[in-house]
């Protein structure tokens, strides 16, 4: 697959940044038309992406047993637009080499792994793996791990690497009751990043969800003792839905879909 993307430079120095972030780089990022999430920054780009995908298919049921993907972006111009106006231009001529492997040994089991290889330093900058299992009664089990080398020097001139574990579950208790939860933990810093637990009751005509969540809102360094201070957000979400008419309360469904891989509404 070959993808060329061009976007002219627009001077955005002094423009505020409310909620835009730089997207995590992965194989799928090779073929997106923006490296930012949000609308506070407009890309400047002149680049070509090259990617190769190979699939091994089971002839009996059409299932993709193994899917292998590898690709890279070649930058034809420096990227002048950055999140912060004071940041330097990005002058590297090519991205990391992105690889992804997905294995499906059975109809309800998926194994995934991804790596980002830095060809300039001959190191693996980022990687991860995950296991996704779904039973016939709509139970979901997810387990994952992700690591990343941080190229930014922080307090004490030490390198803070990223190392995170993630687990989530959806478990029907009866035909109408189900529970769900997620726990994401920072192994490097030794604290929980996200915690979520909830319960759902689903009848023929109506449905109600209640969930509790706490997540990291901000973190900063305490210069006196070289420790990380973590500030958290806490929230209860209640949603009541009359099927075919609409819902009352926050949209918990979209949040669950983003938080739990493979989550589906029980209707």
Question: Language-model segments: which ranges?
Answer:
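Outer-membrane beta-barrel translocator/pore domains, especially the C-terminal barrels
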Residues: 1-267
């Amino acid at each position: 697959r070959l993808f060329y993307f061009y976007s002219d430079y627009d001077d955005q120095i002094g423009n505020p940044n409310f909620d835009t972030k730089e997207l995590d780089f992965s194989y799928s990022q090779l073929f997106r038309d923006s490296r930012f999430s949000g609308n506070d920054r407009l890309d400047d780009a002149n680049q070509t992406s090259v990617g190769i995908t190979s699939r091994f298919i089971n002839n009996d049921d059409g299932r993709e047993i193994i899917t292998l993907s590898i690709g890279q972006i070649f930058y034809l111009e420096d990227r002048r637009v950055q999140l912060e106006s004071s940041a330097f231009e990005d002058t590297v001529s090519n991205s990391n080499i992105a690889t992804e492997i997905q294995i499906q040994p059975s109809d309800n089991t998926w194994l995934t792994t991804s790596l980002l290889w830095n060809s300039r330093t001959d190191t693996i900058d980022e990687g991860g793996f995950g296991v996704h299992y779904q039973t016939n009664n709509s139970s979901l089990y997810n387990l994952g791990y992700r690591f990343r080398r941080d190229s930014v020097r922080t307090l004490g001139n030490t390198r803070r690497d990223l190392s995170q574990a993630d687990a989530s579950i959806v478990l029907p208790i009866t035909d109408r009751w189900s529970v769900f939860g997620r726990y994401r933990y920072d192994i490097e810093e030794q604290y929980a990043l996200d915690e979520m637990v909830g319960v759902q009751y689903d009848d023929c005509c109506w449905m109600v969800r209640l969930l509790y969540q706490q997540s990291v809102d901000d973190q900063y360094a305490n210069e006196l003792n070289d420790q990380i201070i973590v500030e958290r957000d806490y929230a209860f979400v209640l949603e009541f839905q009359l099927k075919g008419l609409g819902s009352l309360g926050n949209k918990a469904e979209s949040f669950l879909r983003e938080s739990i891989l493979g989550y589906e509404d029980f209707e």
